[in-house]
Regions:
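Active-site cavity-forming subdomains of large catalytic enzyme subunits
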Residues: 23-179
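Anionic-ligand anchoring segments at beta-strand to alpha-helix junctions in alpha/beta enzyme folds, i.e.
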Residues: 1-25
Length: 180
């Protein structure tokens, strides 16, 4: 499922703002959008790549509702960073912990260095919890849950594996509700 077929709100971007109130309804919006797309497309099978907090839940519920062969892969979490001054490891929690500081330069440095790359949330919050859950219930291969977003396997290995898994599911008529 290509990203343009779903709408999502990022908790990480909205956190602490008045727009955060739109976050939870993002699950339903993703579900509704994906259900409409899957129902209208006539696809025999679906590979859904999900990111951020709410799309995994909305996607899983749509796939279960639609009940045609499908598999999910997350985009992977962002890697932690290194503080350029202290050489100590940093992560998303580091940004939260320093938020109350009056040192604006320190806050900016930590915010920029704590999550230096790309990927979904690097903490054990909704995103990683849901990816683990989706893997445990059998809708995402477990070895695809935790590698970070920039892990080369996400582009070089996992897509071919997903196609093989989905092809097998289509041939054997294995549907999401048979798995979950």
């Amino acid at each position: 499922v290509q990203p343009e077929y779903t709408v999502a709100t990022s908790d990480g971007i909205r956190n602490g703002t008045k727009e955060m109130r739109y976050s939870l309804i993002g699950r339903e919006v993703t579900n509704d959008t994906l259900c409409e797309h899957l129902s209208a497309s006539g696809l025999e099978g679906t590979i859904a790549v999900v990111a951020c907090d709410k799309p995994p839940v909305g996607t899983l519920s749509a796939i279960l509702e639609h009940n045609r062969p499908a598999i999910i892969m997350s985009d992977g979490p962002i890697r932690p960073g290194i503080d350029s001054v202290t050489n100590e490891p940093l992560d998303i929690i580091s940004s939260y912990q320093i938020a109350g500081s009056e040192d604006e330069e320190l806050k900016r440095r930590i915010a920029c260095e704590a999550c230096p790359g790309y990927g979904s949330c690097g903490g054990m919050f909704t995103y990683n919890t849901m990816q683990t859950f989706i893997g445990v219930v059998g809708m995402q291969p477990l070895h695809m849950v935790s590698p970070p977003s920039d892990d080369k396997r996400r582009l070089d290995v996992f897509p071919d594996q997903l196609i093989t898994y989905l092809d097998n599911m289509v041939k054997k008529d294995i549907k999401p509700r048979d798995i979950v």
